[in-house]
Amino acid sequence: MEERTIPELLRPSHEKGAFFEHCKVCNRELIEAQNDYCIEKVVKKQGDPPVDNVLFEYAICINCMNNLRNQMSAESQSAIMRYQIRKMAESPWQSEEEVMNSFKDDRCLFSGKHRDDMQQYTLVGYCRGKELQADRPPAMLDHLFLEEIQDLISDETRDELDRFSGDNFGWPPEVARQLKNGDLVFL
């Protein structure tokens, strides 16, 4: 049987071995209740020599994620879907197994670029309890792709993402500035 326990990369950076226990938006319990949720973590290399620094991380239950998606314009949802399909078709992976292993191998899902070669990247994992969902592999995405996605979304959707972030996360100013540059993914 394949190991599906959430890997350390997708766990809270401030407490080794811990799991995200509650939805950042509604505070719904995630682990014991076996609720479906998504983890997002944005990491940027800083310093000399460069060291990975977590800019922000959170878990959001699927209900809250779907509520946000429903607020996105149909135009933006369609543009993001087309973009993801195109990028997967252009990716270096030749098999489903290679796609599944890209995260484990510290490689960008779309480009195959190694984590060491990315200045900033986002980690995304869909989970239930303490395990990754078997049908949705975790992903590592080079920040360059997220910038491209930001160029695809409508002003209406961008405003909604900004409002959602402000209402639900209360980020420190340095993180809020980063979010304005399009780091909130919700794939």
Regions found by a protein language model. Name each.
Residues R11, I31, F56, N66-R69, ...:
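Compositionally biased amphipathic helical and low-complexity segments enriched in hydrophobic
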Residues R4-L9, K24, R28, E75-A79, ...:
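A generic short-segment signal for beta-strand/edge and adjacent turn/coil regions
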Residues P50-M81, Q133-D162:
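Short metal-binding segments enriched for Cys and/or His
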Residues M88-L187:
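Long, contiguous alpha-helical scaffold regions
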Residues G17-N53, S102-R136:
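Short recognition patches in nucleic-acid-associated and regulatory proteins
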Residues I6, V25, I31, I39, ...:
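Weak global preference for isoleucine
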Residues N27, N35, N53, N63-N70, ...:
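Detector for Asparagine
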